[in-house]
Curated annotation (Swiss-Prot):
One of its GO terms (molecular function) is translation elongation factor activity. This is Elongation factor G. SUPFAM superfamilies: EF-G C-terminal domain-like (SSF54980), P-loop containing nucleoside triphosphate hydrolases (SSF52540), Ribosomal protein S5 domain 2-like (SSF54211), Translation proteins (SSF50447). Residues 8-287 form the tr-type G domain. It comes from Bartonella tribocorum (strain CIP 105476 / IBS 506).
Length: 694
């Protein structure tokens, strides 16, 4: 089967936005106008095509990036293939956004014309900046009360520190919003608001003529800056033709020198078709962006893979989803080469082979089986056993590891238990499935309490995990309060000589151990034997190590696991008949309990590396608040038009921080935190913790 669409006619893009900027409605309209959807699903009715998980429909927010393939005939009559990835707009799902940005070639940033640039827009914009994703801006909801296009454009500069290139002006606003002025063609486009109606093209209204001339002048000035020859011609008084202007705008957009700004209202069906034309005109195809970098597995040298069907196959798994009909689906972006159903691929990250079963083209939640896929495609693969998010799949003869995605460590933990015994096994299966889908979600078992602990990026993140468990896996669970993972250690050296004796009837038990316990730098446990002359026979020494390790999980102060302990067995004694591995295990356990107390046990707490990105106005408040949380400020730096505050703060003092920061900065500052190291707890705080856990 040959390629149906040339790679230069592909557009892989996503729509990124603040939580209520109208992203799902916009995606629905795009799917409708590109002919895939016959009935538009309105988000406020809970019936949208892209939001295919129940919770998304209930909450009216988009959680999972569903990838959709659709087609659009541009102004030139050529059909283009669009692969659209819907991205979430809530701060707890930024991991989803990172994943989709990683595999996109371009993006549309939606703004609410009333609110302009909102906090989550800033966060997502920064993430897109990290991956240098070319972006256009669409000022949506122009029909809303308080809609202000010019203020939104100003905020793109002041809040995002980005260069806005205005390519359309609105005709009217709020209830009087009729359409747009196309500044390239210098024509007015108006819509009557009915679904699917084409634009009526006419002359620019007389009251907008002057403004349109002024903005076209600015547009040309910014566009010619990206090309030396065009700049020289312009300075000599030669204006670019409309065709040249489009290619200059495309060049500047692809090189991320500026961002074209359009406007409209998706809900009222005004401005959607010109946006689709702009995707074709201005956003890159897979061959317009730099080739993806990777590591050649054989030589360990850096290499690149060109977006070509003739290059060796390489693809990146960026999402795993559970599909009720197909089972587990792995979404992949093919960067180079082509792939047939049924072939064997290598997962170079896991060092495992994968056989390719079904290959699907996804349309939101319907699917189409395909035999072959090509460079630039986004496909869903069924039946992969080993592959998880961020893994590379490639030609086994030309192995490569593409750039890995980086996922932050989870920062919040809660205990979870099934409501009934019958749910115990189902809960384990459900949690493991969900953890395979989402690398920012972890599951572990607490050895002391036997409880299952789940960890994630925030409270909403874990709420939704629990909710999905109930809906998709029919598991009801009780959820505890968020907890801090404390640890214990020792501060000085202690030598313990302990004898374990049991000789009352039957087989006796005897073991004597002399052990030195001392602190060491690392977090692990080190065991060493310095026995000479057979004071403890060789076969019993592993029993000593096993005995100490078995009680390292529960320290003497509050029962937390111990870190950074070294134990050296220096002497001992045994009995020919009564000694055994078990007897030495018991003796070592008791010796450790004595030793931990005598070696000055102390409580340790997790210290988080916190980064707050805030507008300058709130820097003082942010620093003051972090200090009040026992935080150590390690520095501040400018990033664009914002300030980054770096600090080390105990996790125990960070609960509820998101709400404090939100209210302190009117929702404009964001923070990320990840575990850095353990540190001794101040004595006053340690006493409270011991009381609580004793």
């Amino acid at each position: 089967m040959a390629r149906e669409y040339k790679i230069e006619d592909y557009r892989n893009f996503g729509i990124m936005a603040h939580i209520d900027a109208g992203k799902t409605t916009m995606t629905e309209r795009i799917l409708f106008y590109t002919g895939k959807n016959h009935k538009i699903g309105e988000t406020h009715d809970g019936a949208s095509t892209m939001d295919w998980m129940e919770q998304e429909q209930e909450r009216g927010i988009t959680i999972t990036s569903a990838a959709t393939t659709t087609f659009w005939e541009g102004r030139d009559g050529r059909k283009r293939r669009f692969n659209i990835i819907d991205t979430p707009g809530h701060v707890d799902f930024t991991i989803e956004v990172e994943r989709s940005l990683r595999v996109l070639d371009g993006a549309i940033a939606l703004l609410d014309a009333n609110a302009g640039v909102e906090p989550q827009t800033e966060t997502v914009w920064r993430q897109a900046e990290k991956y240098r994703v070319p972006r256009m801006v669409f000022v949506n909801k122009m029909d809303k009360i308080g809609a202000d296009f010019y203020r939104s454009v100003e905020m793109v500069g002041s809040r995002l520190g980005a260069k806005a290139l205005v390519v359309q002006l609105p005709i009217g606003a709020e209830n009087d919003f009729e359409g747009v002025v196309d500044l390239v063609e210098m024509k007015a486009l108006k819509w009557d608001g009915s679904i699917g109606a084409p634009a009526v093209i006419g002359e620019i209204p007389s009251d907008l003529k002057e403004k349109a001339e002024e903005y076209r002048e600015k547009l040309i000035e910014m566009a010619v800056e990206v090309d030396e020859a065009a700049m020289e011609a312009y300075l000599e008084g030669v204006m670019p033709t409309n065709e040249q202007l489009v290619s200059l705008i495309r060049k500047g957009t692809v090189e991320v020198q500026f961002h074209p700004v359009l406007c409209g209202t998706a809900f009222k069906n005004k401005g959607v078709q010109p946006l689709l034309d702009a995707v074709v005109s201005y956003l890159p195809s897979p061959i317009d962006i730099p080739a993806i970098k990777g590591i050649d597995v054989k030589t360990e040298a850096e290499t690149t893979r060109e977006s070509s069907d003739d290059a060796p196959l390489s693809m990146l798994a960026f999402k795993i989803m559970n599909d009720p009909f197909v089972g587990s689906l792995t979404f992949c972006r093919i960067y180079s080469g082509k792939v047939h159903k049924g072939v064997s691929l290598e997962n170079t990250v896991k060092k495992k082979k994968e056989r390719l079963g079904r290959m699907l083209q996804m349309h939101s939640n319907s699917r189409e089986d395909i035999e072959e896929a090509f460079a630039g495609d986004i496909v869903a693969l069924a039946g992969l056993k080993e592959t998880t998010t961020g893994d590379t799949l490639c030609d086994p003869l030309k192995p490569v590891i593409l750039e890995r995605m980086e996922f932050p460590e989870p920062v919040i933990e809660i205990a979870i238990e099934p409501k009934t015994k019958a749910d115990q096994e189902k809960m384990g299966i459900a949690l493991n499935r969900l953890a395979a889908e989402d690398p920012s979600f972890r599951v572990k078992s607490d050895e002391e309490s036997g409880q299952t602990i789940i960890a994630g990026m925030g409270e909403l993140h874990l709420d939704i995990i629990v909710d999905r468990m109930r809906r998709e896996f029919k598991v009801e669970a009780n959820v505890g309060q968020p907890q801090v993972a404390y640890r214990e250690s020792i501060t000085k050296t202690a030598e313990i000589d302990y004898t374990h004796k049991k000789q009352s009837g039957g087989a006796g038990q005897f073991a004597r151990v002399k052990i030195v316990f001392e602190p060491h730098e690392g977090d692990d446990f080190i065991f060493e034997s310095k026995i000479v002359g057979g004071a403890v026979p060789k076969e019993y020494i592993p029993g000593v190590q096993k005995g100490i390790e078995s009680v390292m999980g529960s320290g003497p102060l509050a029962g937390f696991p111990m870190l950074g302990v070294k134990a050296t067995l220096i002497d001992g004694g045994y009995h020919d008949v009564d000694s055994s591995v078990l007897a030495f295990e018991i003796a070592a356990r008791a010796a450790f309990r004595d030793g931990a107390k005598k070696a000055g046990a102390q409580l340790l707490e997790p210290i988080m590396k916190v980064e707050v990105v805030t507008p300058d106005d709130y820097v003082g408040d942010v620093i003051g608040d972090l200090n009040s949380r026992r935080g150590q400020i390690s520095g501040t730096e400018a990033r664009g038009i914002a300030t980054v505050v770096n600090a080390m703060v105990p996790l125990a003092n960070m609960f509820g921080y998101v709400n404090t920061l939100r209210s302190m900065s009117q929702g404009r500052a964001q923070y990320t935190m990840q575990f850095d190291h353990y540190e001794p707890v101040p004595s006053a705080v340690a006493l409270e913790i011991q009381k609580k856990y004793a």
